[in-house]
Amino acid sequence: MGMKQLYIFFKSNHISFLVITIFILVSCYGNVRLFSQPVRVGVILPLFEDSEDEAKKQFGTEVLNGIKFSLSEYYQSHGRDVFLDVRDSKKDIETTVNVLTELAGNDSIICVLGPIYSNELAESADIAFMNQLPVISPTATGDDLADTHDYLFQLNPSYDIRGRIMADYLYKELKMRNFAIISEESYGVNFADHFETEVKKLGGNIAAYETYKRDAKNINDIITELHKVILENDLFINPSNMNLKQREKLERSGVRYGLLDSLISQKTNVSIYYLFGRNAKKIIDTLNIKPYQLKSDSVKFIQGYFDVIYIPISNPSEIGMIVPELYSNGLNYFIAGTGDWNNEKALDENKVYMKNLIFESEYYLDENSPQLKELRSRLQKTDYTLDKSFLFGYDSMGLILHLISEGGTTRQLMYNDLLKVSSYDAVKSKITFDRKRVNSELNILTYDHGLKRICTY
């Protein structure tokens, strides 16, 4: 067929040719967003729109502000092809179920951001599954939610993940083996039980596990129990009772002169494990120094049997009750905690009582981050406040909009793309969904004249 005949064929059959072309494109690129079609994102938050109590409205409003600001930034570079359908849960399970059912019935809704609370998310599971609708909670931390219900996603790591991550970090990265747990008895145990299970799975030893009531005024009874464990298992020496030759041996074996001098002047019994670690017995034998166990009434000593004390609190106010008592009883050498320790004011008030502290948290602001600096600059032109609640909304909406821009414009495409999210750089933390659809990234933080991030783990 010559060029003239080919031209006549295409001209006379241009409609058929166009249809065939579109069919081929759709067949080959069915998952690609060929045309900019508007999509809707459902939002379910405790807004208490019919209440005059501003305190009740604050949290949900701040999260919504973050969502709206993230969307406004998206509009600047992508145009207005994404819309919100915002519903008020009133922090009520029945209301949550009703509004989610309504959203699920609208085919233009490709996913739902919210609800906020774990009990609300649990009741959303069947609706999400039956309608194949991704339901993404920015805050829920409960166990057995996303990991046991398809189409649910948790951007906030669960109790299970938090407990396991701290155990993994302490055991694998810091090489700790002997652990004590002091846990608040109703909320803290959600973390502590998973921590205990993971430590044992790794081969570590939970030498003590004690709990306290949320309204406790002190932990004297717990201190007594920890002392019993120490006195039964720890071995001590007292450099003030040694001759010069023995002291020189200690110094040559790696004991710092400043520490040795302090132990001598204060006549302190010190654990050989504190000085030499897990190989202490072997080292102390080569020095021809005999360690001993302390008597039951001994008070003044530095223990080394516990590598770390893991303390899942229920409120930052408990820090001021626990840490000074640990300090007074020589048990403050190394403390590990949960995200509730992420309170700079409480830590600053108790900094004199802490030597080494690490804890996990889903929230950390890196002031050197260009991403954070740019966000602060943009927010100066608005009435919004950059806080934790705002970022729960901003980061979660940012992830959804990122996936939409990459082609996740239907429920199934959004679901598939969410499953692949790995090391997404949100402002307050990274986001990686594990195979159970729960974010498995946490900041490992410490406190040393201010909060500092050690790593993301």
Name what the model sees in each region:
Residues 2-10, 15-457:
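Extracytosolic ligand-binding ectodomains
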